[in-house]
Amino acid sequence: MFRKVYLILFILSSLSLSCEKEKNSDPSFSLNLSGKKGGVPVRIDWIYKGFPGEMKIYELASQRPVQLWDTNTVSDLDLAPVSSLIEDSKLVLGPGETRKFALVYKNETKDKLYFFAAPHSVNPPEFGFGFKFKCLCVNHLFQVAPGAIWYRIVEIRTMPNWASDPFQITHTLVRVDPSQAKEWNNMGNHSHSDE
């Protein structure tokens, strides 16, 4: 009796493992984007861990020159170097393009907020090749005073022969307790934005 039960469990676990392997690895998969032309929709998404509100993306104001990674807070959105909201956080990118835009967050709480961004991920992952996103996941702790509007100038750069299907880039924004932020700030462990 025990032998039969053991045999059945062994067969079921073998089938389960082979099904799991098939789901995670397709040896016949080979990405081929030849013939793809034109603009590709790229959505910028966010996951929030204790972080209230939402991060939005904006076009840059042409009359206000900015540098990559400029980061600041302002009391009113009109004082930020931005123009229009990018609807659905969706950019359309082409080969060889350099696209700067602004990440914008309004702290509507009564507390100073500290946060960082975990490294971004691309979904589907096969479209993660051929571009560079100079963003906010640079091992840096950011802060926003109550009622303030925080912004950061970022950039996506595609290779001249870049081709893709639509995909999304997702960052996780993690709220940091003020005591932890103070400890990290005292340690002086910051990344440099040019890394």
Regions found by a protein language model. Give the residues of each.
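Sec-dependent N-terminal signal peptides
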Residues: 5-13
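Short, solvent-exposed loop/turn segments enriched in Ser/Thr/Gly
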Residues: 27-28, 96-101, 150-152, 166-168
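Short beta-strand and strand-turn-strand segments in soluble, beta-rich domains
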Residues: 75-86, 124-139
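Intrinsically disordered, low-complexity Pro/Gly/Ser/Thr-rich segments with frequent PxxP/GP/PP motifs
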Residues: 91-93, 97, 134-161
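Asparagine-centered strand-capping/turn motif at beta-strand->loop junctions
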Residues: 104-109, 158
